[in-house]
Amino acid sequence: MKRKISTFTLVAALPALLGAGEPGGTLTVNVSGIRNTAGSLIACVFRDRQGFPTCQKSRSAIIQRSRINGASMTVRFTGLPPGAYVASVQHDEDNDGKLKTNFIGIPKEGVGISNNPGGIPSWGRAVFRMQGDAAIAITMRYI
């Protein structure tokens, strides 16, 4: 009897031991239009409007920073539960961790947002839904 219980316990625990069933999906963000390899790419995913659209002003955004290695890059966010999200990217050319803007708030460094809306970013035009794995494309814009 003990052997049957031990075998059952092992078989039942096998998916967890192998890492199967990790909650949430993977968001793959394909970024294009990066004008040079100076600095780094800051990519973030917002689950709510708090701090949107600036990664650094949000306490709830998931942020990744990567060294730029070409005109296009791919960033992955894992373990995202189903729901509404907005993704944002910034080309931090001087690597200071801040988005440079002019005196009226227009970015001096490259920026991009999910759904690639023109003009001032709005949550409604940038939001997308995830129900598992998803891939989006963001084009970096420089003004």
Q: Each PLM stretch: what is its role?
A:
Residues K2, T7, G19-R49, K98-I143:
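Primarily secretory-pathway and cell-envelope proteins
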Residues R65-A71, R129-M130:
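Short proline/glycine- and polar residue-rich coil/turn motifs
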